[in-house]
């Protein structure tokens, strides 16, 4: 025969399980966002728009949110304020982001903001669009006009890649290897990676 102690312990476990599944259901059915991270020119915005249309989600480009808030282009913010100030602005924008059923394309430097990344991981599934350095170099024509954050004077793209790749891997819930994939193949791969 079960004692009151065993019954209350069982109820407490059951209660925790119900809470867990309630949160899980909320995250998967109400707030399931897809957060795209990766190097500049990895296709976050381009693939993100098409993915959003394909699965019926909204689309948010956090770089555009920054530009709208600051009333300047990214490259102008970086040039006038410096890389560290830009990273602070970017972290504040991404850390305050609220979305439901959206694809969110982030800036390549979003991974420098630990608080923002924790928040984004709570908002949805973080997908790293992984490209080889050679492919990034091929795609990225004008690094200055793109508003790419270089934290050190004279930093090369190879150094930037080496610095960021481990951060993308650290925060990713899923990784899509994009080398050799066309736009539609990339979109299908992202959808598969998040179970859509």
Segments the model singles out, each with a brief description of its role:
Residues 53-62:
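Post-Walker A helix-loop "phosphate-sensing" segment adjacent to the P-loop in P-loop NTPases
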Residues 61-110, 114-121, 146, 167:
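ATP-dependent small-molecule kinase phosphotransfer cores
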Residues 122-166:
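A glycine- and Lys/Arg-enriched "phosphate-lid" helix/loop adjacent to the NTP-binding pocket
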Residues 36:
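Hydrophobic anchor at the beta1->P-loop junction of P-loop NTPases
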Residues 39:
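P-loop (Walker A) phosphate-binding loop of NTP-binding proteins
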Residues 26-29, 50, 54, 163-196:
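NTP-dependent small-molecule kinase module
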Residues 3-5, 26-27:
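Short, positively charged and aromatic/hydrophobic N-terminal segments
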Residues 45:
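Walker A/P-loop
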């Amino acid at each position: 025969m079960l004692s009151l102690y065993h019954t209350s312990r069982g109820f407490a476990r059951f209660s925790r399980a119900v809470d867990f599944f309630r949160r899980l259901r909320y995250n998967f059915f109400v707030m399931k966002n897809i957060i795209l991270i990766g190097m500049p020119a990895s296709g976050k915005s381009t693939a993100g728009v098409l993915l959003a249309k394909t699965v019926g989600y909204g689309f948010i480009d956090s770089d555009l949110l920054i530009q709208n808030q600051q009333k300047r282009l990214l490259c102008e913010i970086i040039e006038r304020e410096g890389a560290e100030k830009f990273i602070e602005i970017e972290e504040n924008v991404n850390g305050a982001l609220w979305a439901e059923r959206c694809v969110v394309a982030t800036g390549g430097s979003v991974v420098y903001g630990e608080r923002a990344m924790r928040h984004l991981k709570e908002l949805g599934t973080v997908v790293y669009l992984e490209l080889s350095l050679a492919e990034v170099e091929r795609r990225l024509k004008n690094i200055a006009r793109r508003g790419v954050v270089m934290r050190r004077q004279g930093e090369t793209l190879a150094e930037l890649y080496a610095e960021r790749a481990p951060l993308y891997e650290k925060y990713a819930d899923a990784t899509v290897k994009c080398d050799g994939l066309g736009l539609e193949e990339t979109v299908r791969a992202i959808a598969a990676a998040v179970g859509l």
